[in-house]
Amino acid sequence: MRLLALVLLLLCAPLRAWTYSLRYGIPESAQVWSILVHLLGDVDNQLLTNLYPLVTGLDDEIDIQENLVALTSNVLRERYDKEDVADLLELYASLYPMGMIQHDISSNAEQDDANSSYFVLNGNRYEKPDDVFYLKSKDLTIQQKVPDVDVIQPYDVVIGTNSEAPILILYGCPTVIDSDFEEFNRNLFMEAMNGEGKFRFIWRSTCSLDGKSVEYPLTHPLEITLQNGSRMSSIPQLKKILYTVPKEILVGADNDDQLHDLEPEELRELDLRVTSLISEFYQYKKDITATLNFTKSIVNNFPLISKQLIKVSSVNKDIITSNEELNSKGFDYNMLGLYINGQNWKITSLTPYNLLTALKTEYQSLLKITNLLQELEPSKCILDSKFLLNKFSQFSLGKLQNLQPIKMDLHTIPGFSESVIYFNDIESDPQYDELVNSVQAFFDKSKFGELPEIKQNWSEIIFVIDFARLEDSEVKEALGGLVRAVNVVSQGYPQRVGLLPFSSDSDKSVVNKIYELKNSTDNLTELKSFLETMLLADGLSANAKHSKHIPVPDVFHLLDELQIDETSIIINGEIYPFRKNAWNYLIAKVIKKDTEFIRKELSNSSPKNKQISVRDLLHYKSANLRHNKYTPNYFADSVYSSVNNTALESVCSERIGYYTKNEEYNLLHTITLVDDFGSIHALKRLRNLLHTSFVGVRIRIIHVGDISDIWYQLRGSLSQKDPIGSINTFIDALKLKKVKSHTYKKSGLNQLGLHKWLPDIPLFELQKGSFIALNGRFIHLDQNEVPETEHFEAIIKREALRTIDSVFALDLLFPGFSQEIINPDLIEMISSILTRLFYQGTHIYNNGIDYTTESSLPRMDLSEFFRPNNLTMFEDGKSASIDLLLILDPLEERTQMILSLVEQFRPLKFVNIQVILMPTLELNIVPIRRIYVDDADIVKSITSEDSRSDPEVDIEMDVPNSFIVDNNYRIKKLLIELHSFSSKTVLSTGNIDGMGGVCLALVDSAGNIIDKTTTMKTFGYGQFHTDKFLKGCYIKSCDSRYTVQSFSTDGHPDFIPSDSLDILSYNPQKIAVKISEEPTHEEEYEEGRNNDTIINIFTILESGPDEEERYMQMILSILSKCPETQKVNFFILDQPFISDTLRKSCEYINSSDEMRGNVIFLNYEWPQWLRPQRFSSRRRDVSRFLFLDVLLPQNISKVLYMSPTEVPLDPFDIFQFQGLKRAPLGLFRMSGDGYWKEGYWEKMLRENNLEFYSTEPAFLVNLERFRELDAGDKYRIHYQRISTDAMSLVNIGQDLVNNLQLEVPIRFLKGSYKKKLVINDECVSEWKKKINKFASSPGDEDVPGESVSSKYQDSDNAAPLHDEL
């Protein structure tokens, strides 16, 4: 019977495997296993081993009909008491149908082998399942000698009972195509798990996403926007939506089918009324889940029930009091949003994928801390870890606010004071005689605003100006700013102003002249006059020639030390690139911050009447060395990893050495140098490190090269009091090549052990050479890079701050902790985890610097402020490791998304949901205009093919920014964002200007171009789109002026270039690209730009079939009159609502030689850094101008924008207009009376002698001139600046271009260009019949007369559209 059972099991096993669903071609077993490895790989390998037979279909008790995710979750809960892992598994499986593909696994399996199974032993490949039973003992013995660390890769799980047995590798994917996988797997498992355990094995899945379409159906929430006057009956599913509204609110609802905005008096207290209603509900139910559902049902359906809300609710005055109490504690509307243990998440980053990853990362990090705390006291639990994190956040918050960007005490740098030319001295100049020399001035009201009336040189602004670049507008503005500042301080303004002049070219005559005038005896009067004249004149070469060649300070060396290579401004020791739009703001910000810091320090430590040096107080923590790599401006620019010192055992103890200078002090800081110490560079690095003067520092070295006599001698020398002499001897011997050394191991260190030690650093980065690690801070070293001792000291000084904060926090958890002997391994690990959580808590994907204009808040300890009052503050009330705090204004559209998002994560038992309601006391605008539908069944109903809504209703699916959705609400493409910078630019959070106007291409592993983009200047932003998952792709330049020097998915100041990119999941992709300028091939670059035979027409459609019909009519009308010598390109912005019918119609046109036209769909998504535009119609309107420079191919020099009309203007006539030389835009003047003739507009236009222009029905653009003026960047920055006001830009596209005429001029088009095109009706009618027939035919029907070269060409590949281009 047992034999029969085994036979049946073997026969049924393949069936069991194939019953699992395939998603993107990935079997469910592979999906579930990859997720489990992702969740448990660093936590519980034994549990993974136990689950392996269940997941891969080897468990005899498995129900072959049961869903594998549900089955595995039940087993986790019932058999292993792993509720947390079970909940996370279900969430990951629902969001990642492809599983969690690990990017840094080197499979060793060829792509051609993806559909076959085999295993590898000793490098030999075995392709028959029965080969498992005939393995030779000799082969197993040879494999057994290979250390496990040389075999096991990240995310590998070793299956087998005998820990001494050799390891085999199984390759395969359990699909129908790979029919042998089940037998391979079963045979290996049986042999590995039997009593003897001849071997162990690892399964490395060959299931691949590479090249598979990303298309997938979605059921994300829908945003249904209804305008005032819309009829409820326009949405057939509205009755289903209303079922989600509480019945008590719908009581008394009238039968008025039409929606109306509320009157101002009805709006005023409505937010308070709704908050009162929610509060009353919670007080009755005492159930936060029910309360959140109740709140969501109101907020999501607000446009439908606003009238009823007025009738059913009244205002609880206690809520106003609660608001006031929150305000007194520092809470305001800028804090609205979602917080994970006090870590704020930007609203644009809130997606199910990001929130799930953030919760999992937070939870597992706290578990790691808990394990470490239990080494000190076994009774400690995960709540103690949360307490520790909160206290660390308290201590670190000040560091984040005051120590970035890095502040320099510049006067400690040799030569600085002698090089700066100061124009005033507050301590001695007569205009400051009325000031007082007492710090009490910081607490008194000042007539100078933030600057106190104190007679000290504590605050200074230094203009660093490149006088070789005065033609640059930024440099000119800097000089003008200096001249104005000098005039202001001469009137008694108490701020020191200085100049640090330099010249970036070989001509130093102007700089020499400036220093000559500095040394004159006229109290700088002549120098001031010289600078004023220079500002007004075109050049001063004549004046500068008379400069005497007197000795001048070595400014070039000084600026090299400060790493300044462009015109900059130094504000109280903080160095910023000078930008004319930002420098005044920066001065105000820094002075306000520093004044508050000094006031706080004086309050804590010093009597107010005491005379002290304010400057010394300001700079007592300042640096005296600036290095963008070792001590970057911002903590976010650094790379941090958690540290797992227990993994160092696998690295091999004989490769590790330690040195401590003084053991009298606790060793809080461990700096590790990982290097090949058989090289001169490595020994020099170590020598410089050993020269550091700090105590309390442990030095660890890890040798990655061959094990030899030199290494043993070096490691032995570390036990000496002063090993530097021995190291110098080794260096001298290596230089003279007199080293005789026996090599014991001719192999380098396997970096996999290092990856386990620093798990947040990608494996490929650890394999790229030497590096430094300091309590989790990671610094890669180039091959010949040798940091000086002062660099090591600067790194230690900077990073020590966070370690000391860790000790302070531990002191609160373990009183007296810092007074006892501290285990350096423990503090290294705990401080590294706390650092990563606090300083980079939102860097969950390790995808580099987040370039954004959106403000974000640091992690804060909000636990002390959250006090449930059952009125506006309530929570689950359970003790959980994660507090998920929602600070909400009930009547705000963001609240819809947050509540719907959080509902998905309520099953997580380790999450405690907290709510703070902060209603607007007086509403004056309609707060919510959209219905938010998150019920999956209703979403499916609305989005189904046979249940479309009225076209006048705007329906959008709320998907992550990286998802591009089609008209069937399926993922159509994935968005990949990039930021391009000059190879000379050091990447930093402070970077704003990138490389704009550069064409870049995304290329797959076979060399095929997937997509092209043109970059913006702001953040160097660009975007690619892919409709396939990709492995091994890369980025290259498609612009002959530039070359891609390097790129990385983890962009930071010292990033290690990636060899390739993998796009294998839904996680957001952000790529940093470094670009170098190549010699300009002007003729090659300009070729084909101007072609008079091609007319380019650009259009952005509104939604609805009527608009599409007008557009098609316009195309056919224009083509019916197209001369035989010309062709017309119709560019259209691709949008989700565009129908398949229109796409097929365009396909026909592109295939017709008769029509001489081409319709090109352009892809461009709203950039994440740009302030979102809520209403889609306004988004489309302003996009006509915001993205012109990056949306259209670079080889297009002239384009006509036309709104869809059945009888269009004559584009052939307008295109002949030659007046766009200085001005890039040609628009028709606005006629009649309107808002532009009153108020702000009337005044602005009159004072600047400007006209007001209309953007309808067409406008002409000289794209070459548009790009020369950086018009696109100017429009985007102007939009970003003024769109903070919800009432600005009422007619958004039209108002934007009219408002910026002084920077982007407009030329008027004569009224005669408004003449209508005379249409060939007969031709249009005939074409329509053919198109309609083709559009209604099956999708695979060929177009009559279609040739290979004329097939429809999508714009994903922005290649030239015609040979003429």
Swiss-Prot record:
Residues 1-17 form the signal peptide. Disulfide bonds: none annotated. A motif (Prevents secretion from ER) lies at residues 1362-1365. One of its GO terms (cellular component) is endoplasmic reticulum lumen. Residues 1334-1365 are annotated as: Disordered. Keywords: Cell wall biogenesis/degradation, Endoplasmic reticulum, Glycoprotein, Signal. It holds the Pfam family Thioredoxin_14. Glycans are attached at residues 115, 228, 293, 457, 519, 523, 644, 870, 1091, 1150, 1195. GO terms for molecular function: UDP-glucose:glycoprotein glucosyltransferase activity; unfolded protein binding. InterPro entries: Glyco_transf_24, UDP-g_GGtrans, UGGT_TRXL_2, UGGT_TRXL_3. It is found in: Endoplasmic reticulum lumen. Present with 815 molecules/cell in log phase SD medium. To D.melanogaster UGGG. This is Killer toxin-resistance protein 5. It comes from Saccharomyces cerevisiae (strain ATCC 204508 / S288c) (Baker's yeast). The gene is KRE5.
